[in-house]
């Protein structure tokens, strides 16, 4: 089961669109679920995601026009409970102790957060944490040179194989990370 994880697009305010090389990789009909950390900013970005997969889950980012997106969400995909937040609620941004507290409050196997615009994935106390970064490479409050990135999770039974796609220069680099639920 394939799950696309992305966020912080900031279209059209900070970027015009997803990188063309990412659009070529994101083929309709291949992905079953989309988990988005927010800051899509417009309905057009949401409509584009709906063309990729029927099951789209979005939480509200601090720049989203749609105030109907929830602040947080917990979804179950296969054997995994997955928590989804934008990440502006985590202080300081990306702080491990704050993320671990949210993971325990949500009682999830995987916690997905964004807001920092920087990819990160790691295991902590037998739980998995993912920040997909910014799919467009949009700048953030602290940094202008952001590497565009998104994550594709392949969920099979009690294992998640995470593929991280990063646009470095003109090349899409892919890294593989495996997490087994204990």
UniProtKB/Swiss-Prot annotation:
Belongs to the VPS29 family. It is found in: Cytoplasm; Membrane; Endosome membrane; Early endosome. Component of the commander complex consisting of the CCC subcomplex and the retriever subcomplex. Component of the heterotrimeric retriever complex formed by VPS26C, VPS29 and VPS35L; within the complex interacts with VPS35L. Component of the heterotrimeric retromer cargo-selective complex (CSC), also described as vacuolar protein sorting subcomplex (VPS), formed by VPS26 (VPS26A or VPS26B), VPS29 and VPS35. The CSC has a highly elongated structure with VPS26 and VPS29 binding independently at opposite distal ends of VPS35 as central platform. The modification N6-acetyllysine is found at residue 50. Keywords: Acetylation, Cytoplasm, Endosome, Membrane, Metal-binding, Protein transport, Transport, Zinc. This is Vacuolar protein sorting-associated protein 29. Gene3D superfamilies: 3.60.21.10. It is a peripheral membrane protein. It comes from Pongo abelii (Sumatran orangutan). Its main location: cytoplasm. SUPFAM superfamilies: Metallo-dependent phosphatases. Component of the commander complex that is essential for endosomal recycling of transmembrane cargos; the commander complex is composed of the CCC subcomplex and the retriever subcomplex. Component of the retriever complex, which is a heterotrimeric complex related to retromer cargo-selective complex (CSC) and essential for retromer-independent retrieval and recycling of numerous cargos such as integrin alpha-5/beta-1 (ITGA5:ITGB1). Component of the retromer cargo-selective complex (CSC). GO terms for molecular function: metal ion binding. One of its GO terms (biological process) is protein transport. InterPro entries: Calcineurin-like_PHP_lpxH, Metallo-depent_PP-like, Phosphodiesterase_MJ0936/Vps29, Vps29. GO terms for cellular component: cytosol; early endosome; endosome membrane; late endosome; retromer complex.
């Amino acid at each position: 089961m394939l799950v696309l994880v992305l966020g912080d697009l900031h279209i059209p305010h900070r970027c015009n669109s997803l990188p063309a090389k990412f659009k070529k990789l994101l083929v309709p009909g291949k992905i079953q679920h989309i988990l988005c950390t927010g800051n899509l900013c417009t309905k057009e970005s949401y409509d584009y995601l709906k063309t990729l997969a029927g099951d789209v889950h979005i939480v509200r980012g601090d720049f989203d026009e749609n105030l109907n997106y929830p602040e947080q969400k917990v979804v179950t995909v296969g054997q995994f409970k997955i928590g989804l937040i934008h990440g502006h609620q985590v202080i300081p941004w990306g702080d491990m102790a704050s993320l671990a507290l949210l993971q325990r409050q949500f009682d999830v196997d995987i916690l997905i957060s964004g807001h920092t615009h920087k990819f990160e994935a790691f295991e902590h106390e037998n739980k998995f944490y993912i920040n997909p970064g910014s799919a467009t490479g949009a700048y953030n409050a602290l940094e202008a040179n952001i590497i565009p990135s998104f994550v594709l999770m392949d969920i099979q039974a009690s294992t998640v194989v995470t593929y991280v796609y990063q646009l470095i220069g003109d090349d899409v680099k892919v890294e593989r990370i495996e997490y087994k639920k204990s």
